[in-house]
Amino acid sequence: MSTQTRYPEATIEADREVPIIRITRDFRGTPAQLMKAHTDPELFVRWVGPDSISSRIVEWDVRNGGSWRYVSSRGDDEFAFRGCFHTVSDDTIVQTFTWEGMPDQVALETLHFEDLGDGTTRLHAQSLCDSFEARDGWLSSGMEVGVNEGYAKLDGLLGEL
């Protein structure tokens, strides 16, 4: 699969020992720009998810202990997601992530923005799922399409910041 990005698609890996998904991708932008794109609700909805959906923010309280919820739509179908921000710092976000279609499956996500020193930032994302079955369900869902199409949109957005 190919997208129009300056960088290769995201690397998506599953850990064999623990139910973790790791995603790594480089972006042309600073850690501060990537943090802003992940925490500013008006920017976030412009890039999150595949091209075939649109998203709206329902709740967005970016602070340690704050919560968030957004709804993505495709035609008449809606998909709601929610979580809590546990840590928000200059280069790291730790949050929970739940798709409301399976509310008992909660993942703990860590996003870290590594400054590579040449105007490039490497995103390290890790999702610790509550079971191997949940993790494998994510991986078999076609999530890579949403990840890569969303990150391609994020590439374009970073050029505006």
Where are these regions (language model features)?
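Hydrophobic ligand-binding cavity/cleft-lining segments
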Residues: 1-53
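Intrinsic-disorder/low-complexity, polar/charged segments enriched in Ser/Thr/Lys/Arg/Asp/Glu/Gln
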Residues: 18-24, 31, 55, 67, ...
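A short, structured loop/turn motif at beta-sheet edges
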Residues: 31-32, 63, 86-91, 113-122
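Short beta-edge strand/loop motif at the mouth of beta-sheet-based domains
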Residues: 22-23, 42-80
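Beta-strand/loop substructures that line and gate deep hydrophobic ligand-binding cavities in soluble
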Residues: 20, 94, 98-148
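Hydrophobic/aromatic beta-strand elements that line small-molecule binding cavities or substrate pockets
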Residues: 24-25, 57-60, 81-86, 97, ...
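Short, highly charged C-terminal tails/helix-capping segments
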Residues: 57, 158-161
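Hydrophobic pocket/interface hotspot
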Residues: 34, 44, 68, 85, ...
